[in-house]
Swiss-Prot record:
Binds 1 [4Fe-4S] cluster per subunit. The gene is nadA1. Its cofactor is [4Fe-4S] cluster. Catalyzes the condensation of iminoaspartate with dihydroxyacetone phosphate to form quinolinate. Pathway: Cofactor biosynthesis; NAD(+) biosynthesis; quinolinate from iminoaspartate: step 1/1. It comes from Methanosarcina acetivorans (strain ATCC 35395 / DSM 2834 / JCM 12185 / C2A). Belongs to the quinolinate synthase family. Type 2 subfamily. This is Quinolinate synthase 1. Transmembrane segments: none annotated. Its EC number is 2.5.1.72.
């Protein structure tokens, strides 16, 4: 089927199913273009709650679909590619987290939304890269357990007086972005601003002109007087950057800055999910209720 025919059929089924399509910025360009809403993890969580559709088709990885199912239990949540798991989310396990909690009984668990529903259920509050600092600083404690990303934990630790007890996880895509990659790109494009995601290594963030979530990176590039930008995150964001500020130039930091899991969803799989209503994301109710408490606490935190 030609792309135009795929798009037409998806649009028809979307109306028939009363469905809404949500996509992360790291998805394929054609998937972002057909989505009703494209955003970062925080915005997508908020949008899942706002939408009054019967069906949410989540173009992203498994934990994103789970978050939508947790927050909107009466809606049917579809994940076009059921095997699109997040490697970082898989780096933390429930039993290991329970043992860490036993070692630090006074420290609440702050879980990055890039985690499974089971991990969220073991957490006091969730966070995203857009609100991690505000979430941690909102807690009236001296120390927190932060899972699963050690790089985001280090970024938060540099912006709070609280002791951060990190889990030893990381995003493989961001962790592969090296300091020498940045220095080479800066030498090649001396006028370009380097904007980076806080999942990057600390020594990479030291070189950044601005550190932000994907949405924050887009807003910075759009509002900056600079004309060129080196992009320190998954290169799918460049599509969103071009749409927000097409007159500017963007350079992908590295050929390795590509998340295979985020690229698994394509138009064919999106169509199949709507046609067959397949790959429904479900979360056991006992887990869902506990995980929702952590997500609700996050959504109540005010972000500057």
């Amino acid at each position: 089927m030609q792309q135009a025919d795929l798009i037409k059929r998806i649009q028809e089924l979307k109306v028939k199913r009363n469905a809404v399509i949500l996509s992360h910025y790291y998805s394929r360009p054609e998937v972002q273009d057909i989505a009703d809403f494209v955003g970062d993890s925080l915005a997508l969580s908020q949008e899942a709650v706002r939408q009054d559709a019967d069906v949410i088709v989540f173009c992203g990885v498994h934990f994103m679909g789970e978050s939508a199912a947790i927050l909107s239990p009466k809606k049917t949540v579809l994940l076009p590619e059921i095997d699109s798991t997040c490697p970082m989310a898989d780096m933390v396990d429930v039993e290991g987290l329970k043992r860490l909690k036993e070692k630090h009984p006074e420290a609440p668990v702050v879980s990055y939304v890039n985690s499974s529903a089971a991990i969220k259920a073991e957490s006091y509050i969730c966070c995203t890269s857009a609100n991690a600092v505000e979430v941690v600083n909102s807690l009236d404690v001296d120390e927190v357990i932060f899972v699963p990303d050690k790089n985001l934990a280090a970024y938060v630790a540099s912006r709070t007086d609280k002791k951060i007890i990190p889990w030893e996880g990381h995003c493989p895509t961001h962790h592969q972005i090296l300091r020498e990659d940045v220095l080479k790109m800066k030498e090649k494009h001396p006028l370009a601003k380097f904007i980076a995601h806080p999942e990057c290594r600390p020594d990479v963030l030291e070189l950044a002109d601005h550190v932000a979530s994907t949405r924050g990176m887009i807003m910075y590039a759009k509002n900056s007087p600079a004309r060129e930008f080196i992009i320190g995150t998954e290169c799918g964001l460049i599509h969103g950057l071009h749409k927000a500020a097409p007159e500017k130039t963007y350079y992908c930091i590295s050929e390795f800055a590509c998340c295979p899991s985020m690229k698994m969803v394509n138009l064919e799989k999106l169509l199949a999910s709507l046609e067959k209503m397949q790959h429904v994301v479900t979360v056991p109710e006992e887990v869902r209720v506990r995980a929702k408490e952590a997500l609700d606490r996050m959504l109540a935190v005010k972000v500057k």
